[in-house]
A protein has these predicted regions:
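Membrane-embedded catalytic cores of phosphoryl/pyrophosphoryl-handling enzymes
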Residues: 1-133
Length: 133
């Protein structure tokens, strides 16, 4: 019998880090940027074919965060709720960091604008997080 480590599952640490890092990426890059010439592999992974849909940077960043979280679920390390809540905790940590960073800039700066994992949008400027409707 193999004993599992005496650590808690909730919330998933990898998902928390992924949520924080991906939130920072969405703040720093244009989420609406459409990736040029996307490709997809064939069924056995030996050939890359043109992908006919459009891929937005923000959607791909969100997918990256989700893949980190879900991968840990598939490994049996976490429950799905551990990962989902970990992403949100990481997102909140990143928003706090961005809020503080917005007060430290000497240059003229309109702030960070980004979408959250729930689809809502925020603007962060002068130490304030403004939720847009």
């Amino acid at each position: 019998v193999q004993q599992e480590p005496a650590t808690v599952a909730y919330q998933a640490g990898h998902a928390t880090v992924a949520g924080s890092c991906c939130t920072d990426l969405k703040a720093l890059f244009n989420e609406d940027f459409v990736l040029p010439r996307p490709v997809v592999s064939n069924d056995d992974g030996t050939v890359l074919n043109a992908y006919n849909g459009s891929l937005r940077a923000g959607d791909e960043i969100n997918k990256l965060a989700a893949n980190v979280s879900i991968g840990r679920d598939a490994a049996g390390v976490h429950y799905r709720s551990d990962g989902i809540d970990g992403l949100v905790v990481g997102e909140q940590q990143a928003l706090t960091l961005l809020r503080e960073a917005s007060t430290l800039l000497n240059e003229d700066f309109d702030g960070f604008t980004l979408s959250l994992f729930d689809g809502s949008r925020v603007r962060i400027t002068d130490g304030q997080i403004i939720y847009e409707h």
